[in-house]
């Protein structure tokens, strides 16, 4: 297999903070800052990082949030403002690794750690609240610029300037882009749903969601 390496432009960490939106206070872990030194990556998160909503964020299948730097120019134009790394609450801002060319089940070495793509990121309302744009979640779904999650196969220290080195490809070759398209735009495509479900590395939450989609499409006996 051809050796593939991708640059981590920024390693971002942050504990939950309180934001105010429409007169209401919310707890969120979306506010992150670039790390200046190496930190440990554990099974469920980076040392010094955290999530407020542990039902929809975090956990073994969503230990590391990744976002492609390639999308930043689009969002800067859409939002009419400059954006810095970590603007989308991602742990890793990466170059060259997008929803189009990364597949569920892909395994990477990240400095001392080993990680695996588990699912696309599912945009939540806190993105809209952070940017003050109500249609933000819908726009992320429409563009497919979601980012994705890693689970941690081997814990280890990660430096801010680390690279992602591809070790193996997902068995079924299901790109994050493909999974997003079926989830948001073609949810009655039974053949595609069954293909996605055939990927053993798919996260538990996305597997449950696609099983529900499949059950709705099967004839009632």
Swiss-Prot record:
GO terms for molecular function: molybdenum ion binding; oxidoreductase activity; pyridoxal phosphate binding. It holds the Pfam family MOSC. One of its GO terms (cellular component) is cytosol. InterPro entries: Benzoxazolinone_Detox_Enz (IPR052353), MoCF_Sase_C (IPR005302), Pyrv_Knase-like_insert_dom_sf (IPR011037), YiiM-like_3-alpha_domain (IPR005163). Residues 33-167 form the MOSC domain. PANTHER family: MOSC DOMAIN-CONTAINING PROTEIN, PROTEIN YIIM. This is Uncharacterized protein YflK. It comes from Bacillus subtilis (strain 168). The lineage of its organism: Bacteria, Bacillati, Bacillota, Bacilli, Bacillales.
